[in-house]
Swiss-Prot record:
Keywords: Cytoplasm, Hydrolase, Nucleus, Protein phosphatase. Residues 200-220 are annotated as: Disordered. This is Dual specificity phosphatase 29. It is found in: Cytoplasm; Nucleus. The active site is at residue 146.
Length: 220
């Protein structure tokens, strides 16, 4: 299932997260605040019931499960060039660069447990950088997977959309959930919420700085 870039909207979010959609594009996030865990889970519940082995959630970006990652022939036939394993390790999905050594596939492993107490946030930026680099070429196609393709892999894809596609957490959830049934655990949602706060604050500060520079230029 192919999906294009989403229209930024918070119409289905909680009132505290609803954007007022002002005229100036640079003011879009002025009234945004990160929803709580329950409100975020409701966004997932409103998403697509579709849950197959693998689904495209953003152009050339797919979330899948262990079966997809282990199917070397299927990956090659589908044209995947990159694999991000969010369940790397002996006791999870034990693949790695050697597993794909005779294939034109670049591998990145994240050794993570699907537990609310596990700190997945330390992998947000490295994983997002790997995904972003993979999508830098129109010829590339990346699979992000864990065991079920619902929690760890979805969390890293959401972080990527927030970091490199300038989406809020709500926007990112809506984009992914309309294409695949996913649901990160409560701990991961809390970590994504913290990332959301940081990114929104950074954008507000950058916008404030730009506004100050423009005001100074007008005075000259």
């Amino acid at each position: 299932m192919t999906s294009g870039e989403p229209k930024t909207s918070l119409k289905n979010a909680c009132p505290s997260a609803r954007r007022l959609l002002p005229k100036a594009e640079e003011e879009e996030e002025a009234d945004y605040c990160a929803p709580g865990a329950f409100e975020l889970e409701r966004l997932f519940w409103k998403g697509s019931p579709q849950y197959t082995h693998v689904n495209e959630v953003w152009p050339k970006l797919y979330i899948g499960d262990e079966a997809t990652a282990l199917d070397r022939y299927g990956l090659q036939k589908a044209g995947f060039t990159h694999v991000l394993n969010a369940a790397h390790g002996r006791w999870n999905v034990d693949t790695g660069p050697e597993y794909y050594r005779d294939m034109a596939i670049e591998y990145h492993g994240v050794e993570a447990d699907d537990l609310p107490t596990f700190d997945l946030s330390v992998f947000f930026y490295p994983a997002a950088a790997f995904i972003h680099a993979a999508l830098g070429s129109d010829h590339n196609k990346i699979l992000v997977h864990c065991v079920m393709g619902r929690s760890r892999s979805a969390t890293l894809v959401l972080a990527y959309l927030m970091i490199h596609r300038n989406m809020t957490l709500v926007d990112a959830i809506q984009q992914v959930a309309k294409n695949r049934c996913v649901l990160p655990n409560r701990g991961f949602l809390k970590q994504l919420r913290e990332l959301d706060k940081q990114l929104v604050q950074q954008r507000r500060q950058a916008q404030s700085s730009d506004d100050s520079e423009k005001a100074s230029e007008k005075e000259l």
